């Protein structure tokens, strides 16, 4: 029996300009979390990761952080990470494993992995994949950090936004 809680980063899940090395390392932590969860399940050990959007000494110098309101600063307090970590260590979370939790203030999300088509299989024809991808993209979080990308970060061409 046990609990492992790793720390990844939004840079490793969603990317951040100028942080390719850091983002790659934190993406590795996310993958490590999923794989070790599989490997340690037989020992009743859960492995999860926090993906914190938190204001700290490390993030204080990032662009835009000095313009945050007091309310935004509170929402990005590291204390929210502690609440999620404590819950992941609880008995209530005994079956939660291999997940990466995006945590920012009163907001929490789960980074999703594989999504299959309506038949439960990957379409073999690109024409058949199109409708599934359109549906998935319509439900996906828009990545506003894709500065300079023609889609403006939506993953869709400008004329379809």
What are these regions (language model features)?
Residues 9:
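Residue(s) in the substrate-gating loop at a strand-loop-helix junction
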Residues 12-14, 56:
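Conserved catalytic-site region of short-chain dehydrogenase/reductase
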Residues 22:
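Catalytic tyrosine of NAD(P)H-dependent dehydrogenase/reductases that use a Tyr as the general acid/base
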Residues 43, 50-61:
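Short, flexible catalytic-loop segment of classical short-chain dehydrogenase/reductase
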Residues 49, 68-161:
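C-terminal helical subdomain
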Residues 25:
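Active-site helix of classical SDR
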Residues 14, 30, 35-45, 91-95:
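Active-site-adjacent segment of SDR/Rossmann-fold oxidoreductases
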